[in-house]
Amino acid sequence: MASEDVKTDRRYTKDHEWAQPHAGNVRVGITAFAVDQLGDITLVNLDVKAGDELTVGKAFGTIESVKTLSDLFAPISGKVAGVNPELEHKPELVNDDCYDKAWMIEIVPSDATELEGLLDHATYAELLKTAHH
């Protein structure tokens, strides 16, 4: 992944998820690097619903591809505001538009400083350079 595939308007995790401030909440999805590693997405299973509480690192679902099955983890703590209803019927959206249309969950953050503790775009871009062995 080239560094231009790293959006500057969000934070990142070492697990290749992104967290983007959105109307007072935080939307969560996976990065282009993660999509590239997974291949064609066949199923997105979100195990949470609006009102559920999440803590950092708690699994909130799985993503399945032709290659593998991966867990999805909450990058911040908070209450689930909603899940992306499109992904249940259109998992391929993740391949097509992982940064916008294929957001997975939206969280009402319980601690705004957790978002600041995630990787900024420049740090994440550096991480990607070392991911290419």
For each predicted feature, which ranges?
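Residue-level recognition of beta-strand microenvironments
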Residues: 19-21, 46, 66, 83-86
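Short, charged beta-turn/beta-strand-edge "cap" motif at the junction between a beta-strand
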Residues: 59-61, 66-68, 86-87, 111
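Small beta-strand-rich domains/subdomains or short beta-sheet motifs embedded
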Residues: 11, 53, 64, 70-74
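A short, compositionally biased micro-patch
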Residues: 21, 65-66, 75, 110
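Aromatic- and Lys/Arg-enriched surface recognition patch
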Residues: 81-105
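Structural motif
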Residues: 25, 77-79
